[in-house]
């Protein structure tokens, strides 16, 4: 399978995935140019909307 790469940026946190995919963190699967991203090997596009009094619904 062909891997996908994703970066995550928070509104207040900035680049959350900074330094996530380095040779030190992933070993021999390291790919130059993807240092601030994470490798996505699977994805479930489900969206969960919390409901109930705690969430104002």
Swiss-Prot record:
Keywords: Secreted. Its main location: secreted. It is found in: Secreted. Transmembrane segments: none annotated. Belongs to the hcp1 family. First appears in the mid-log phase. Present at highest concentration in the late-log early-stationary phase, before gradually diminishing. Significant amounts are still present after 30 hours. This is Major exported protein. It comes from Pseudomonas syringae pv. ribicola.
């Amino acid at each position: 399978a062909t891997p996908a790469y994703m970066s995550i940026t928070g509104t207040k946190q900035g680049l959350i995935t900074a330094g996530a995919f380095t040779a030190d963190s992933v070993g021999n699967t390291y790919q130059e140019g993807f240092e601030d991203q994470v490798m996505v090997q699977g994805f479930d596009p489900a969206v969960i909307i919390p409901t109930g009094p705690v969430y104002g619904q």
